[in-house]
UniProtKB/Swiss-Prot annotation:
It comes from Ectopseudomonas mendocina (Pseudomonas mendocina). Keywords: Aromatic hydrocarbons catabolism, Iron, Metal-binding, Monooxygenase, NAD, Oxidoreductase. Signal peptide: none annotated. This is Toluene-4-monooxygenase system, hydroxylase component subunit alpha. Its EC number is 1.14.13.236.
Length: 500
């Protein structure tokens, strides 16, 4: 049988759209699941994804990528990455696997929703491949850390995090439930693939792979690079969906979805990626600061993408840019202080050399966060460990599910943004978090953050120990501690004496 060239049949297969006859169009694509906004079927046929592939091509490429990822892992199993890596890098692996691995299965659901309920045939076609991509990512990122479980119980949280009530896991689940499992097909295309994957994770994986290579962890570098090549393809589904909405008079609705998702993604990105780049990664392995990464890879790309589509930058853009300078430093300090509530060991990252680097990258760092670290360092050196460990829980944002933070020092700016809705008082970490809630209160109003649950009596006993048990920690070995066992404080002794 003769093989027809791809160009003869590809457009027909990717654009095939059945005209329903046994059911109505609305029954086939209900608005609640589809999100078509009343745009008729024939309009959605103009959807044109920029990255095209066929099933035979997909299978061939994926087979090669899987063979490469698993063979590199097998070849490097004797490299003793765990034993030879800096503890800060090991913490990077733990936080990544716990926050992302099982979340990939939520992404399978999102891609499946587009594959079934999107009116655009091109979207359904690409989402089918995206669904298989995300399944692959989940399997890879559960298999790779499994070998470390026998050496370190915290690696078991690659699987357990999403099955727990740990605060960072709650934050991640709340976000992914919002932009994936709790949204219609077109909202998923915009909020997941455009705002989160194209805007954040696609670029982050490039940076993470580079950092892994610098740290000598070629197994993880190869894994992340393999995943990123999938992301770069299926992340392209949101752009054409936005373009189609704009062309059919739905620009305002499209803009709002983008604005909501970018902010939600940013807050989670700041707490998971910012500390990794500026504090956990060993100083000699840092290729650039988190701020430099954001401006080089994220900000410019978002601006170009939005302008090309005919959308505006989000109304909070100036607040976003200010956040890039400040937010993750405060998040890092909070995570380190409440380290017992994390499934990884936060690295302080504040030796004299690291502080010089932070001051160079973020002028004024020493006058703000540095002052707090001075007090922490002094307490550690004087064996006042009770003053560098928590006794209760912090205030937590009802949107991001992350503790409320501000800038310390002379620029102290902590502010709580509250809202009373249906007789309940909600607290938010920023004006934008509150705005997101107001756009869709039904989506968020019944959720209780970790502190809400504590105050409602769901956590017993009402102590830090009770909270740790509620979060799912089964032993002290699983609870976070300082990654370097406070060895960094000894390096600060000469500087502290000179200051005194």
């Amino acid at each position: 049988m003769a093989m027809h060239p791809r160009k003869d049949w590809y457009e027909l297969t990717r654009a095939t759209n059945w005209t329903p006859s046994y059911v109505t169009e609305e029954q086939l694509f209900p608005e609640r699941m589809s999100g078509h906004m009343g745009i008729p079927l024939e309009k959605w046929e103009s959807y044109d994804e920029p990255y095209k592939t066929s099933y035979p091509e997909y299978v061939s490429i994926q087979r090669e990528k899987d063979a490469g990822a698993y063979s590199v892992k097998a070849a490097l199993e004797r490299a003793k990455i765990y034993e030879n890596s800096d503890p800060g890098w090991i913490s990077t692996l733990k936080s990544h696997y716990g926050a992302i691995a099982v979340g990939e299965y939520a992404a399978v659901t999102g891609e499946g929703r587009m594959a079934r309920f999107s009116k655009a045939p091109g979207n359904r076609n690409m989402a089918t491949f995206g669904m298989m991509d995300e399944l692959r990512h989940g399997q890879l990122q559960l298999f790779f850390p499994h070998e470390y479980c026998k050496k370190d119980r915290q690696f078991d949280w690659a699987w357990r995090a999403y099955h727990s009530n740990e605060w960072a896991a709650i934050a991640a689940k709340h976000f992914f439930d919002d932009i994936i499992t709790g949204r219609d097909a077109i909202s998923v295309a915009i909020m997941l693939t455009f705002s989160f994957e194209t805007g954040f994770t696609n670029m982050q994986f490039l940076g993470l792979a580079a950092d892994a290579a610098e740290a000598g962890d070629y197994t993880f570098a190869n894994l992340i690079s393999s995943i990123q090549t999938d992301e770069s393809r299926h992340a392209q589904q949101g752009g054409p969906a936005l373009q189609l909405l704009i062309e059919n008079g739905k620009r305002e609705e499209a803009q709002k979805k983008v604005d909501m998702a970018i902010w939600r993604a940013w807050r989670l990105f700041a707490v998971l990626t910012g500390p990794v780049m500026d504090y956990y990664t060993p100083l000699e392995d840092r290729s650039q600061s988190f701020k430099e990464f954001m401006y080089e890879w994220i900000i410019g790309q978002f601006e170009r993408s939005l302008i090309d589509l005919g959308l505006d930058k989000p109304w909070y853009w100036d607040l976003f840019l200010k956040d890039i300078d400040e937010l993750h430093h405060s998040y890092h300090m909070g995570v380190w202080y409440w380290r017992t509530t994390a499934w990884w060991n936060p690295a302080a990252g504040v030796t004299p050399e690291e502080r010089d680097w932070l001051e160079e990258k973020y002028p004024g760092w020493n006058k703000r966060w540095g002052r707090c670290w001075d007090v922490i360092t002094e307490n550690v050196l004087n064996d006042r460990m009770d003053l560098v460990s928590p006794e209760t829980l912090p205030s937590v944002c009802n949107m991001s599910q992350i503790p409320l933070v501000g800038v310390p020092g002379d620029d102290w700016n902590i502010e709580v943004f509250s809202l009373e809705h249906n007789g309940r008082l909600y607290h938010f970490g920023s004006e934008v978090d509150r705005w997101v809630f107001q756009q869709d209160p039904v989506q968020y109003q019944n959720h209780m953050n970790i502190v809400d649950r504590f105050l409602a009596g769901q956590i017993q006993p009402m102590t830090l120990e009770g909270a740790l048990k509620y979060m799912g920690f089964q032993s002290i070995e699983e609870m976070g501690k300082d990654a370097h066992d406070f060895a960094w404080a000894d390096k600060c002794k000469p500087a502290m004496k000179k200051s005194a």
